[in-house]
Amino acid sequence: LAFPLAINNTKSRLQYLPLMLKAPYVVTGASRGLGRAIARNLAECGHPIIAISRDAVSLGLAGAEFADIQADSITITCDLADRADIAAAAEQIKAKTGWIAGIIHNAGIISPIKSIAEVDRANWARNIQINLVGVQDLTNRLMPVLGGEKQTRITTISSGASLRAISGWSAYCVAKAGLDMWAKCMAEEGAENNISAISIAPGIVDTDMQKTIRSSNEDDFPDYETFVELHKDGQLVNPKLVAGQLGPLITGHSMEQSGMRFDVREL
């Protein structure tokens, strides 16, 4: 049966999904930036992609690109802030494949950029949901198609903010620190079922997140000028270059490396 590039989040469509011929990699935040670059790199290396993003328009464009390289690649529109969306996406993935080669938990937001005293509580919680809770929720729901006879490799995208406190970034720092520990816990618990998990800090990448940082102000973010200067000085790294550096770890890290945190600048 023919399969449309984009899947709507409705269970009624599941009966029409043919199984993928090759094991896919699931990439969240795959519609742009680093996630899109990682997904394309994986497709070019011969892996079908299940690309996830909340931006349906950008995801459609990215998905067409991936499908041109690997015909089995598909897209699923899913907002990781919405737990019902996550549940529906997981069901669609399980209907599409009996085993996942890997998951790249790339989706993330930097907002809100505000002090702990002044930040909107709902926005702070939304950051934690997308950057951390959504990772656990999606992975938990996909456990039936992870590991087993073959190793499933899970990669989380870390940040220097996971290691140090940054004024104005409390939600992001907390979420990324939690994500590093989540990867360690996943590695510990997944070992007996051939599931590995690592975290990788990609450095300062030229993405929309950097634009969001530069659109903030010094009152909310004391390090504002530092990031403006990094952009002016051409210090931001192209996502395609970073994706190429991360690729071997994403697809080839060993069970012995599971639980480790890597920094792209040290690879």
Q: Model features per residue range: what roles?
A:
Residues 159:
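Residue(s) in the substrate-gating loop at a strand-loop-helix junction
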Residues 87, 110-125, 168-171:
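Conserved mid-core segment of classical short-chain dehydrogenase/reductases
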Residues 45-61:
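Conserved glycine-rich Rossmann-like NAD(P)H-binding loop of the short-chain dehydrogenase/reductase
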Residues 117-136, 155, 179:
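Catalytic Tyr-X3-Lys loop
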Residues 164, 185-195:
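Active-site-adjacent segment of SDR/Rossmann-fold oxidoreductases
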Residues 139, 175:
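Active-site helix of classical SDR
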Residues 199-202, 207, 218-267:
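C-terminal helical subdomain
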